[in-house]
């Protein structure tokens, strides 16, 4: 990643720490992955504090595939089977079956309905019966070890929530351009400025976690 493009958001450590602070205060962040990987930017929000307005922004400016990133423990708690037994996707993106809240939604498509589904899934006492399958929210299972084992947006989302001291569940959606194409670094940065959001990279988060673990040891 061209660090010059991101310099206005701080150095790598500052970018992570500012992103964590933003998440603690209920704001969203934008996360870029490697140029040699998907080379895309995702909007990421805390699942426990996301608002209807933020969900509407996500749907309006994103791919439409609103994903809920979960730990393996939460996936098991909700008894969500993986979408396929043999994952042949290029980056091994770990989708489970899609979900809908069993109560409190209409068609499940609106911003409010999708948020209701997410809140049902992350509730402390959530049960499998609280969710219908299929639905309009796409859960993703994060790998144990986070970005240190897989450099994906799913793992970055759960790592960010954990480091921020929040529930380890987050909402992500790929940012798209007005013509429907995927947003890359320049477009992501322009969107961030327009919507007062912070930008960081998965590479920043990997370095931050490695430094933190070295310090702890």
Curated annotation (Swiss-Prot):
Molecular functions (GO terms): 3,4-dihydroxy-2-butanone-4-phosphate synthase activity; magnesium ion binding; manganese ion binding
SS bonds (residue pairs): none
Textual note on the cofactor: Binds 2 divalent metal cations per subunit. Magnesium or manganese.
Metal-binding among keywords: yes
Record bears the keyword Manganese: yes
Family note: Belongs to the DHBP synthase family.
Subunit organization: Homodimer.
Official protein name in the record: 3,4-dihydroxy-2-butanone 4-phosphate synthase
Gene name linked to the record: ribB
């Amino acid at each position: 990643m061209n660090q010059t493009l991101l310099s206005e958001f701080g150095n790598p450590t500052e970018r992570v720490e500012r992103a964590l602070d933003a998440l603690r205060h209920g704001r969203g962040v934008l996360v870029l992955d490697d140029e040699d990987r998907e080379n895309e930017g995702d909007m990421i929000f805390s699942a426990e504090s996301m608002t209807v307005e933020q969900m509407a922004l996500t749907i309006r400016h994103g791919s439409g595939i609103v994903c809920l990133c979960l730990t393996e423990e939460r996936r098991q708690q909700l008894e969500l089977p993986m979408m396929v037994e043999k994952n042949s996707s290029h980056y091994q993106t770990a989708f489970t079956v899609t979900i809908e809240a069993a109560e409190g939604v209409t068609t499940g498509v609106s911003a409010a309905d999708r948020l209701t589904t997410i809140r049902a899934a992350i509730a402390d006492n959530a049960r499998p019966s609280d969710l219908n399958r299929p639905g309009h929210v796409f859960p993703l299972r994060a790998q144990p070890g986070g970005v240190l084992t897989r450099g994906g947006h799913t793992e970055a989302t759960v790592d960010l929530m954990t480091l921020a001291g929040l529930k380890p569940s987050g909402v992500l959606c790929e940012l798209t351009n007005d013509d429907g194409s995927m947003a890359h670094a320049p477009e992501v940065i322009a969107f961030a400025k327009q919507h007062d959001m912070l930008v960081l990279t998965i590479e920043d988060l990997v370095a931050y976690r490695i430094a933190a673990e070295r310090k702890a040891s």
